[in-house]
A protein has these predicted regions:
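Peripheral interaction segments used for macromolecular assembly
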Residues: 1-107
């Protein structure tokens, strides 16, 4: 089933051990491939946004508007913050993948 990214803005994001926030944006690479969800951690970690790879999604329920990530809350809490002012370059991606202990998509 294909869905517009507009439809998924605001979807609730669940870690393996609880809610972490909502989808607030998407990041695509220079080949226009969707690589990351930007998550607004809202009430849980006020003011913090994080980028999580679409490869780390374990399931999506469009009826409940929920995306389940294959990551624990503590790891997200300790992870690199994302901001619109920050250039999403290979150095940032390398740190991101190393922190979450997932292999980078470019290797």
């Amino acid at each position: 089933m294909l869905m517009s990214t507009k439809e998924t803005l605001g979807y609730t994001i669940l870690a393996t051990d609880g809610e972490i926030g909502q989808v607030s944006d998407f990041l695509v690479d220079d080949q226009f491939k969707l690589r990351y969800l930007v998550i607004d951690t809202g009430k849980w970690l006020p003011g913090k946004k994080v980028a999580l790879s679409t490869a780390w999604i374990s399931s999506v329920d469009p009826h409940k508007q929920v995306v389940v990530m294959n990551i624990e809350r503590k790891r997200i809490q300790e992870g690199p913050e994302y901001s619109e002012e920050h250039v999403l370059d290979r150095e940032y991606e390398t740190r991101l993948h190393a922190h979450y202990q997932y292999p980078p998509y470019w290797m």
